[in-house]
């Protein structure tokens, strides 16, 4: 399934397909000409998918480099962003090259922020691997890092060139990560999609949801797309959480 996010300045597609990660090289080649590509991921996701993703990209003609940050919220910081800037500079990435965010919401926020600020902005792609990131945070262009004073205090709005969602990645998620995504799905269904609400009500457990993930993720992405198209900058949202 392919959905288009249509915006005044930059439109892009959400590709939702079981097994899509196995063809990531072909997908990226459809968006970019062969060039240098930096992959930002975390240590957990790297062990699962890093080598395979690099192999696919190289087979499609891309020159790749990969950096894995520590998994978890602690990596969503200005200090980690600085490490990533240094890495991109060492790899000699220019504005004609690209960056891929491979991971959950932390990686997506962090990599998107780095891509939007490195050399005043380079092209990037989102490849979310958690349910929450697939139905929410990878779509819409919000990027941010935390500071000691607040969560999401420093950030940008920067739209990716595309989003690739492979429901197969949910099979390696911890149950609590699946539940985090389910909470967002339930919220979306309650607010905007009665049919999705009834569909969720018919599921027996988390495993049942994962088995029907492509259908459910697609429904949620349609909701998120509509929200983003209506108000790209979500001007009424307040996403920073000040710390005392």
State where each predicted segment sits.
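Acidic-aromatic/histidine active-site loop/patch
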Residues: 105
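A glycine/threonine-rich phosphate-anchoring loop and its flanking beta-alpha core
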Residues: 15, 113-206
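Non-catalytic interfacial helical region
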Residues: 85-102, 111-126
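ATP/NTP phosphate-donor binding region
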Residues: 1-98
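Generic structural signal for well-ordered, non-membrane alpha-helical segments
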Residues: 21, 46, 50, 81, ...
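Catalytic nucleophile loop
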Residues: 108
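Active-site segments that bind and position negatively charged phosphate/pyrophosphate groups
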Residues: 203-240, 244
């Amino acid at each position: 399934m392919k959905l288009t996010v249509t915006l005044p300045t930059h439109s892009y597609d959400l590709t939702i397909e079981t097994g899509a990660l196995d063809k990531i090289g072909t997908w990226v080649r459809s968006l970019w000409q062969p060039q240098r590509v930096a992959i930002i991921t975390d240590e957990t996701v790297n062990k699962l998918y890093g080598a395979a993703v690099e192999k696919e990209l190289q087979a499609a003609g891309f020159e790749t480099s990969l950096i894995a940050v520590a998994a978890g919220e602690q990596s969503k910081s200005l200090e980690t962003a600085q490490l990533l800037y240094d890495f991109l500079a060492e790899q000699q990435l220019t504005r004609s090259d690209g960056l891929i965010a491979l991971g959950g919401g932390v990686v997506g926020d962090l990599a998107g922020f780095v891509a939007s600020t490195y050399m005043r902005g380079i092209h990037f792609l989102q490849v979310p691997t958690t349910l929450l990131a697939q139905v929410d945070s990878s779509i819409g262009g919000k990027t941010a890092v935390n500071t000691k004073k607040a969560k999401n205090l420093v950030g940008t709005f920067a739209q990716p060139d595309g989003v690739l969602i492979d429901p197969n990645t949910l099979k390696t998620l911890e149950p609590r990560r699946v539940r985090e995504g389910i909470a967002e799905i339930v919220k979306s269904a309650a607010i905007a999609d009665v049919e999705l609400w009834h569909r969720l009500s018919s599921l027996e457990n988390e495993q049942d949801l994962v088995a029907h993930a492509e259908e459910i993720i697609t429904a949620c992405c349609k909701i998120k797309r509509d929200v983003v198209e209506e108000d790209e900058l979500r001007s009424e949202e307040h996403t920073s959480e000040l710390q005392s």
